[in-house]
Amino acid sequence: MGMVVSLQTVVSMVHDDPGFYNPATYLITGPLILIWLLIALRSRFSKERMWLALAVISALSLLPVYHRIYDAKLLLLSIPACAMLWAEGGLIAWLALAINLLALLFTSDLPWVFFSIMLSHLRPTLPWLSGPILNAIVALPAPTMLLLMSIFYLWIYVRRSSNAAEPARMIDKIASAR
């Protein structure tokens, strides 16, 4: 369990049954992948959207299926999107930097050695946390950070795609027609 970065490791701490954690993982990641795919297919090409799309899928592709920690080197593909957001400045730039740094830290080889040693001494339930979901987030930060990174970059990607404003315009037209 210690060297696997897929979301199944987190969900299995809630209920350790493949009949539960596999479908639960697909229900979490499936809609995110579908949104990414729809935006990628419907948006006009631009370098900005290309880097954002790559940042999303580099993290998101690790979550639904079995991956080891060394597969997380794919996260290096998110650095250009982070640099692009950093150059723009503001709160989004700081969020991108923090999320990228934490995701890269939690999936790096040396910090993971520390986490695996810590995990071997960790009790199944932490007394200061309530519930298996919080235990999983603390015990397995890599998949949790990958999910956070995926959602963050997907949010930016959707907001900046040319078709993202279309549903909002349609809702405005419907509301003004009444």
Model features per residue range: what roles?
Residues 27-35, 56-60, 75, 99-105, ...:
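Lipid-exposed faces of alpha-helical membrane segments in multi-pass integral membrane proteins
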Residues 1-52, 58-69, 130-133, 137, ...:
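Primarily membrane-embedded glycan-assembly and transfer machineries that use lipid-linked glycans
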Residues 14, 33, 43, 77, ...:
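Residue-level detector of solvent-exposed, low-hydrophobicity positions
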Residues 29, 78, 92-93:
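Residue-level signal for alpha-helical context at structural boundaries
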Residues 36-40, 63, 82-86, 153-157:
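Hydrophobic membrane-targeting alpha-helices
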Residues 86-178:
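Aromatic-enriched
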Residues 68-85:
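Hydrophobic/aromatic-rich transmembrane helices and adjacent perimembrane loops
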